[in-house]
Amino acid sequence: MARQKFERKKPHVNIGTIGHVDHGKTTLTAAITMAMAARGGGKGKKYDDIDSAPEEKQRGITINTAHVEYETEKRHYAHVDCPGHADYVKNMITGAAQMDGAILVVSGADGPMPQTKEHILLAKQVGVPNVVVFLNKEDQVDDAELLELVELEVRETLDNYEFPGDEIPIVPGSALLALQALSENPEITPGQNPWVDKIFKLMDTVDAYIPTPERDTEKPFLMAVEDVFSITGRGTVATGRVERGSVKVGETIEIVGLRETRTTTVTGLEMFQKTLEESVAGDNVGVLLRGIQKIDIQRGMVLAKPGSITPHTKFTAQVYILTRDEGGRHTPFFAGYRPQFYVRTTDVTGKIETFRTDDDQPTQMVMPGDRIKMEVELIQPIAIEKGMRFAIREGGRTVGAGVVSAIVL
């Protein structure tokens, strides 16, 4: 059977469910896919289809994630749900699923729990921009005042982690009762079941509150250099994949990282042996540069729109250290450890100055499997920005993965 063509009729948004274990994330994901299928947008998935998440490998780390897709009237969504807590942590740090927004699931019967807070903190640190709350298990709360208290507590918790707690929409409901109703009648329409209506309401809220993200083509141009060669009589060509934005022949760009930043002009663009006038995000392209010698440019530098990115040596990051079973280290390490930081296309040696645990306590020793904050100083400046992902490597193998939380220097 021929594959269906993916048609881009609606804007695409990446979303995920986050929250404490057993508060109903996977049940909600199943209820959403079935409710949207009932409205005519996609194919419903049952709980078991989502819960048996396939393993994915991202930067050498195995993560169980389930991706489902569905459509609302306004958008096409790709939705990620991770079964295990450790998978969430790894997923968010490695960016296996970069979320444009998240649905935070909180049980109305229990209120915010430790992992609720951990996921909110993580969402903040890895740059999930917007959150909508689903207050689940409403059917288990007899007292309306109790539900209001839980709602206040959720808003307060969000405020503590610098999300706009007062503005964030909170939709109460019961994922389980909605899912049961949808399983009995997969073609249910709005107005037939109050619990299913709450799922429709949740998705209308997500449509309205989570903005359509700026796509990579609209951002300032950036391409990490993968290879460099010279063409006699024409000059130097840098090849790589355009990470974001677009570039045209004749435009001025900067070469950033590893050495002094230099400015040059794009004199030609080539892809698959054909010349282009313009290259956009996602293209694998050769960029011909005016007045640049082959020795002036190397793998690990980036070509970028002037002023859009600067080289740095010091940053803080949120990092997950692989366990022995995941192919990571067998032994702990200490402050002063000097691994390689693999950023975009190159390894740069860096020294880990300090560590802090997740609850912000200073610590001296880091064990495989830990999640920590660290401050790093690289021996060479490279183009770094907040929210950028990297791998930590030692002797060619990945021992950790991280995301830049802040630039220090």
Swiss-Prot record:
Which residue ranges does the record assign to the tr-type G domain? 10-214
Residue ranges for the region (G4) are 136-139
The record lists GTP as bound by 19-26, 81-85, 136-139
Subcellular location field: Plastid, Chloroplast
Keywords in alphabetical order, please.
Chloroplast, Elongation factor, GTP-binding, Hydrolase, Magnesium, Metal-binding, Nucleotide-binding, Plastid, Protein biosynthesis
Which superkingdom heads the taxonomic lineage of this protein's source?
Eukaryota
Catalysed reactions, semicolon-separated: GTP + H2O = GDP + phosphate + H(+)
**Biological processes, Gene Ontology terms:** mitochondrial translational elongation
Q: Please give the residue ranges the record annotates as the region G3.
A: 81-84
Instruction: Indicate which residues the UniProt annotation says bind Mg(2+).
Output: 26
Q: Which residue intervals make up region (G1)?
A: 19-26
Region named G5: 174-176
Q: Among the entry's GO cellular component annotations, what is one?
A: chloroplast
Q: Which GO terms describe its molecular function?
A: GTP binding; GTPase activity; translation elongation factor activity
User: Which residues lie within the region annotated G2?
Assistant: 60-64
**Enzyme nomenclature, EC number:** 3.6.5.3
Matching Pfam families? GTP_EFTU, GTP_EFTU_D2, GTP_EFTU_D3
UniProt similarity note = Belongs to the TRAFAC class translation factor GTPase superfamily. Classic translation factor GTPase family. EF-Tu/EF-1A subfamily.
Say what the protein does: GTP hydrolase that promotes the GTP-dependent binding of aminoacyl-tRNA to the A-site of ribosomes during protein biosynthesis.
What this protein is called in its record is Elongation factor Tu, chloroplastic
State which gene encodes it: tufA
